[in-house]
A protein has these predicted regions:
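Short, surface-exposed coil-to-beta transition loops
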Residues: 52-55, 68-70, 101-103, 110-114
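Short Gly/Thr-rich strand-loop-strand
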Residues: 86-109
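Short helix/turn-capping signatures at newly exposed starts of structured segments
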Residues: 1-93, 133-134
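Short, exposed beta-strand-loop hairpins at the edges of beta-sheets
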Residues: 106-130
Length: 134
């Protein structure tokens, strides 16, 4: 678990407007940006975060300020189990009862980024990661 924590901390400290650094951290190649209204989006099919295979990697950033960005990707099976708090300021959120299909997740402030660790319906299996820099 310590390695996973370090991998997330390292990734969240990379400036998201430095696409080469993100490609290196995720062992991938984010494609050229496509414009979606006021956002630019770069996509990669798969990569690695430490020992975890990741897929459906998306980097969405403000067209006028690429440092304001959200990086989101899925974790390919087999994943890892998050049974306990990782960072001191972590909060576990239950599924929303008013939202069908809603799943639990952990959230934490890591470096200057908001990190969300999405869980499967079993409340422990990591399914996706979202990192937002503002």
């Amino acid at each position: 678990m310590e390695r996973f924590k370090n991998d997330i901390e390292r990734l969240s400290s990379v400036r998201f407007d430095d696409v080469d650094a993100l490609n290196e951290q995720l062992h991938t190649h984010l494609g050229e940006p496509t414009r979606q209204d006021v956002m630019d989006e770069r996509i990669a099919g798969h990569g690695m975060l430490g020992d975890l295979e990741v897929r459906n990697i998306r980097l969405r950033s403000a067209a006028d300020d690429p440092a304001l960005a959200n990086l989101i990707f899925e974790i390919a099976p087999p994943s890892i189990a998050l049974k306990e708090i990782i960072w001191e300021n972590s909060t576990k959120h239950p599924p929303r009862p008013d939202a069908p299909g809603s799943r639990p997740y952990w959230s934490a402030q890591v470096n200057d980024a908001k990190v969300v660790l999405g869980l499967d319906s079993d409340n422990v299996t990591l399914t996706y990661i979202s990192i937002s820099q503002r």
